[in-house]
Amino acid sequence: LANRANILNLTRNTQFDMKIERPTHSAVAMATLLLLAAAPRLSAAPGRPGPPTRDPHTPGYVTATELPDGTNAPADQDGNFILGPTHLRAPEMTAQPGVPQGKVYDFVLSSSNSTIYPGIARDPGTFGTPDPADPAKLLVPTSHPHPYTRHLAVYVPAQYTPGTPAPFIVGADGPDHGLFTALDNLIAEHKVPAMVAISIGNGSGDAQGSERGLEYDTMSGRYAEFVETEILPLVEQQCHVTLTKDPDARATMGGSSGGSCALIMAWYHNDLYHRVLTYSGTYVNQQWPSNPETPHGAWEFHEHLIPDSPVKPIRLWLEVGDRDNYNPNVMRDNLHDWVVANENMAKVLAAKGYHYQFVFARNAGHTDRAVKQQTLPEALEWLWKDYQPAAK
């Protein structure tokens, strides 16, 4: 037991502040409480009604296959699917007896060690106001430099052979220990490759003017470059793994703005990532500061970028809930409807001939926990279905 993860090793003069192997249940619980405290609230603001419930058969929405209640889309099929209203937890989301468990390393990183993201924050209780000259642009004068810490959790599968290049998946808004459990089971069932999972916490806050918003909603290669230059070298050094350089063996995932971030990484650095998995992806106008090249933020993906660009080697799984976010901020630019945004994504992906699977979930809110517990194993299996390891 002396080697278990309840031993805390404090380190100095490194890129990180803390390293733990196999966090104890109490440590995981504390981290969960901290993350919940920092996470954006999903309830409607006082005086504002909650989002409407959408019918997946609304005229103008994509044609989709209605699945039997409680079942998932087939892991070997592309296209559009409707599931729910019952969401049954997939067995792979629970640790199974006899299944080898990967090793998990936890770190706490400081903004003082980042050259790409030194840190910003918005003053508490403030948000922003629409630009009088452009309702699609938000002015946030209360955003300013501010330090942060972020959590990083790295899962190394029990089946990893030291020295060999490992496939991996990068996740936003980490740590996501449910992902690690799912991988334990899926790897043991030979449904996905033995991959490393790198679950990166955000730099705090939410939406325009925050560190999280800057990282996840900016339409550029900046976040992928942060991961490539500041996170992956640390993972290789401290977790004793070799990470593949093959973009077809690299995936990204996330929910909400973390979902749009996942696609942004693969779109702007398609040389690094080919596989993307998103829940309630924020394919809306959330970018700040505004960029004249992409004035509508991630709404540009389905408005211009995907329709007007050559097809990229991206395989994309995406989900949205029937009660997903609908214009939750002060902007009234008609570019903040999560359901319409994800429906539009499915349309343009189909029109361009992408490999994609779109899930419309009934009885589901924004980044719905029950939906994720039902669908994540199938989504991961679909995401890696065509993966072929590079020839040695």
Ranges and model annotations:
Residues A29-R41:
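Bacterial N-terminal signal peptides
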Residues Y61, P68-K392:
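Non-catalytic cap/lid and distal C-terminal segments of serine-dependent acyl enzymes
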Residues R4, L8-L10:
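Short hydrophobic targeting helices and cationic amphipathic motifs
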Residues L42-P46:
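Boundary at the C-terminal end of the N-terminal hydrophobic targeting segment
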Residues P49-E66, A90:
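Short acidic, Pro/Gly- and aromatic-enriched capping/linker segments at domain boundaries
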